[in-house]
Each structure stands twice: as C-alpha cells, then as structure tokens.
C-alpha cells in the first residue's frame, strides 16, 4: 500500500510540510510508504518564493510525476497553509490537473496549518473539492497552528504539540482502515 501527500505551500520547509513528514513516520509503523510531493520543491506554476522560475520542461516533468504518483497511490492527503481563509492557489492549480480518475473512491486525508487565526475552513473547502472528484474525505482532519511546532537545529520544523501528535496517529490509523476495508473497490 502506498500514499501520496501533496503539499500546497509556496514556502520550502513549511509547517504544513513538517506535519506531512510527521505523518510519513506514522505510516511507516503500518509498513506503508507515504511519499510527499511538495509543490514548493516541485512547482507547477509561477508563484515561487525562492526567486527562481522553473523552465517549462521542468514544470511539465513535475506535472507528469504528480499524475503518475497520484494514479498509483492507494490514498491521497492534501496539505495546505491557510491562505486568506481557504486553501492555497498552488494546491488549486495542482488539483486542476488531476481529474476524477486520480481520486475516484480513494480515501483522502486533509491537513492544514495557520500562521495567524487558527481555522479549519481551508479543509472544509477541500472536503467539497474531494467530494466533487469522487474521493472519500476521511472524517478526521488536522488543522494546526504555527505554535504547535518547534524548530530543529537545522531550522526545519517538527510537530511539538502532544495533542496533535495523538490526532496525527488517529488520522493515519483512520486512513489505513479506510484503505484496508474499502467497500468501494469495485467502483474504482
């Protein structure tokens, strides 16, 4: 079993990507590979905080990689920062390239992080998108705040809040359960 976590932040080493890294460790306890596709590192559009714009060929290759990984995944996780009360345009751009074939009857987890006001609104918006793509948004979602993280010596973030660590384990267990017990396999 394998999954794909798509991170829709323009910032490299974002809080959302730190949460995704934390989740991948918990999937490993179930012998599940969950790969991260970080749109800050593999951009599909022109918004780029690093100051470099990738070539058209690089963008096309990134899109090809995303589509192949999404199609092969048994589940997907969509991760976003809270941008103006919703999910990021970067994630929206990526989702515009993935049709129902990539989501149909697959469990989809939703994770997000807010730097300002804590809000799960971006995840509520994504829940509607997942439904329209025929995916199955799992009930447990994770909406963190910057204060739920601490910094490693190298400057990268890690999830430091014990309540969210517990919620992350529940989230992973729920996705694994949905994949292992899917009554929808015949509908794919």
Curated annotation (Swiss-Prot):
Its EC number is 1.7.1.17. Catalyzes the reductive cleavage of azo bond in aromatic azo compounds to the corresponding amines. Requires NADPH, but not NADH, as an electron donor for its activity. The enzyme can also reduce a wide range of sulfonated azo dyes. The substrate preference order is methyl red > Ponceau BS, Ponceau S > Orange II > Amaranth. It is an enzyme of class 1 (oxidoreductase). This is FMN-dependent NADPH-azoreductase. One of its GO terms (molecular function) is FMN binding. Induction: Constitutively expressed. Optimum pH is 6.0-6.6. PANTHER family: CHROMATE REDUCTASE (PTHR30543), NAD(P)H-DEPENDENT FMN REDUCTASE LOT6 (PTHR30543:SF21). Optimum temperature is 35-40 degrees Celsius. Inactive above 60 degrees Celsius. Thermostable up to 55 degrees Celsius. It comes from Staphylococcus aureus.
């Amino acid at each position: 079993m394998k999954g794909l976590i798509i991170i829709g932040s323009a910032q490299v080493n974002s809080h959302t990507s730190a949460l995704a890294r934390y989740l991948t460790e918990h999937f490993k306890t179930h012998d599940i590979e969950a790969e991260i596709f970080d749109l800050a590192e593999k951009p599909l559009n022109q918004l780029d905080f690093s100051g470099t714009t990738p070539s058209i060929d690089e963008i096309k290759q990134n899109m090809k990689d995303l589509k192949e990984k999404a199609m092969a995944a048994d589940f997907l996780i969509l991760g976003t920062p809270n941008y103006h009360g919703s999910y990021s345009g970067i994630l929206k751009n990526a989702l515009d390239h993935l049709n129902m074939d990539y989501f149909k009857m697959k469990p989809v987890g939703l994770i997000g992080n807010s730097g300002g006001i804590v809000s799960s609104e971006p995840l509520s918006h994504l829940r509607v998108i997942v439904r329209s793509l025929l995916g199955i948004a799992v009930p447990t979602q994770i909406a963190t705040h910057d204060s739920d993280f601490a910094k490693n010596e190298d400057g990268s973030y890690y999830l430091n809040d014990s309540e969210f660590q517990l919620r992350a384990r529940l989230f992973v267990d729920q996705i694994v359960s949905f994949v292992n017990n899917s009554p929808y396999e015949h509908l794919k």
